[in-house]
Regions:
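Catalytic cores of glycan-processing enzymes that make or break glycosidic bonds
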Residues: 1-168
Length: 168
């Protein structure tokens, strides 16, 4: 906290040891974005590496939705993502055959992160058409709105079930 203001450090991208030490000293939680996790096996964005003092996200407003991301990644990245999630989620008796958006939500909800956040577009399973923002572009940014048709008993029960399952 900074006074009464809660602070989340945007510690994304290349982090030097100096920056990591500064963040640790500050006590502010950092960010863990699961979409960033699958470029290497030692990625700090893999959920089994999350510490409690962090905020875990499926993706951010500047990323594609999970479904949109998954549709555009390379076959190698997709294979690594699938294999990692299968192994990681098996510890929590999660259904590996869920759609990718729900596996991502299960993965961060199961993590040690004190706070977990998923965009509504990821709960719904929208693809590229649900993207909130594409940095350095004009036109369609920040126009997505939750349409009433998506607010279903199935969606509400799904959110309730994952929240209860992982005691969030």
């Amino acid at each position: 906290r900074l006074g009464k203001l809660p602070i989340i450090a945007e510690d994304l991208g290349l982090l030097t040891e100096r920056v990591k030490k500064l963040l640790k000293r500050s006590g502010f939680p950092g960010m863990k974005v699961l979409e960033f996790a699958f470029d290497s096996e030692d990625s700090d964005y893999l959920p089994h590496k999350y510490e409690e003092n962090c905020v875990a996200y499926t993706g951010t407003h500047d990323n594609n939705t999970v479904t949109g991301w998954y549709e555009t990644i390379s076959p190698e990245t997709k294979n690594y993502c699938d294999e990692y999630l299968k192994k990681y989620l098996s510890k929590f008796e999660s259904d590996y055959w869920l759609p990718i958006n729900l596996r991502f939500i299960d993965a961060i909800w199961a993590s040690k992160a004190n706070i977990v956040i998923a965009q509504m577009q990821d709960f719904i399973g929208l693809g590229e058409n649900g993207r909130m923002n594409a940095p350095s572009t004009l036109g369609k940014n920040w126009k997505w709105r939750l349409n009433e048709k998506y607010i279903t008993d199935e969606l509400c029960n799904g959110i309730k079930m994952v929240t209860r399952k992982f005691k969030r």
